[in-house]
Amino acid sequence: MKVIFSIVVFSVLILLFRHKRIETKIVINQPIDHVWQVFKCKSSHPKWNTLFGIDRFPTHVGQQISVDLYNENRNVQFSMQPVIKKLDKYHLEWEGKLYINGLFNGKHQFIFTKIDDNTTQLVQAEDFNGLLVPILNYFVIQPTKFNFDRMNKSFKKYTEDQTLNNDNCKVPR
């Protein structure tokens, strides 16, 4: 009877807590066009991106890209191939999954908002869904929020110190 009760309780918990959203925000003291150009400049990513590496910056919705997630030493911890769900000016969103759909899915968002002519807000968020969310919350989801904050701070510092003037990544100033 205890085993059946435990299975029922565990099943109910999985059904109730299979969604989790994390969100971080940072204000960057640069115009939004400059911030967006730095973000899109793939060749600058190794200088500031402590969270992931991408094979190329996406160009259209529906495109599949390769993303390598880093650990704190910037070694590849996990690779995935998410699909671009939204790509507008100042907004990038992709969706990926762990092995099969519904097990552990994530929708990652980068949203840049103009505060004033010289200030931009970056919101980085992830919506996790799936059966493994309750189990992976402590070991994966909570450390991910910490890593978002770390990447945001690194991106802010790099962007505020950077004047883009090379051929690959130009920003009119």
Where are these regions (language model features)?
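Short C-terminal domain-edge/linker segments immediately following a structured domain
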Residues: D55-P58, S66-Y70, K97-I100, T113-D116, ...
